[in-house]
């Protein structure tokens, strides 16, 4: 282990201490190690260039002019990346969607960036996990000749 000294401004130190208290860390070192690990994992996920799976989460105002149509067009244009979507009505105007994606990391990021940039999308986050590409396989189905 290495001993490291860092300098933090008062506001950042206050926020760190709040995290330590909320999560029950025994000391600041444990919290900083965990935060460093999270940052390293996030950076690795963001720079992944190979195949991955991911979850794209975003909220949007469905009453914004043409937004639902634009989102649908984007999903049809990127149909090869999208595996499933869950749609939730948060209130009269706001919707939450969670979409499971599968493909090249840069393509997933490009797709997510396009969705998040649409006017009326209020929050967006893409979480990716490196994964092996699926193997191509054939399906053989037996059919009853009498049907």
UniProtKB/Swiss-Prot annotation:
Entry keywords, A to Z: DNA-binding, Metal-binding, Nickel, Transcription, Transcription regulation
Co-factor binding comment: Binds 1 nickel ion per subunit.
GO MF, any single term: DNA binding
Claim: Electron transport is one of the keywords in the record: no
UniProt xrefs under InterPro entries: Acetolactate_synth/TF_NikR_C, ACT-like_dom_sf, Arc_rbn_hlx_hlx, CopG, CopG/NikR_regulator, Ni_resp_reg_NikR, Nickel_NikR_proteobac, Ribbon_hlx_hlx
Binding site for Ni(2+): 76, 87, 89, 95
Matches recorded under Pfam families: NikR_C, RHH_1
Cofactor or coenzyme needed: Ni(2+)
The keyword DNA-binding is annotated on this UniProt entry: yes
GO biological process: response to nickel cation
Annotated HAMAP family: NikR
Family (UniProt): Belongs to the transcriptional regulatory CopG/NikR family.
Function, as annotated: Transcriptional regulator.
Protein name: Putative nickel-responsive regulator
Taxon lineage: Bacteria, Pseudomonadati, Pseudomonadota, Alphaproteobacteria, Hyphomicrobiales
């Amino acid at each position: 282990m290495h001993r490291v000294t860092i300098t933090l401004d008062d506001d950042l130190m206050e926020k760190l201490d709040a995290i330590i208290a909320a999560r029950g860390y025994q000391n600041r070192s444990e919290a900083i190690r965990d935060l460093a690990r999270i940052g390293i994992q996030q950076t690795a996920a963001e720079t992944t260039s190979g195949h991955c799976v991911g979850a794209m989460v975003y909220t949007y105002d469905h009453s914004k002019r043409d937004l639902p149509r634009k989102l649908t067009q984007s999903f049809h244009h990127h149909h090869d990346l999208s595996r499933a979507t869950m749609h939730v009505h948060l209130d009269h105007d706001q919707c939450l969607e969670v979409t499971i994606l599968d493909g090249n990391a840069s393509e997933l990021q490009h797709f997510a960036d396009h969705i998040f940039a649409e006017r009326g999308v209020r929050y967006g986050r893409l979480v990716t996990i490196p994964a092996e590409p699926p193997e191509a396989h054939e399906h053989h189905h037996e059919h009853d000749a009498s049907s």
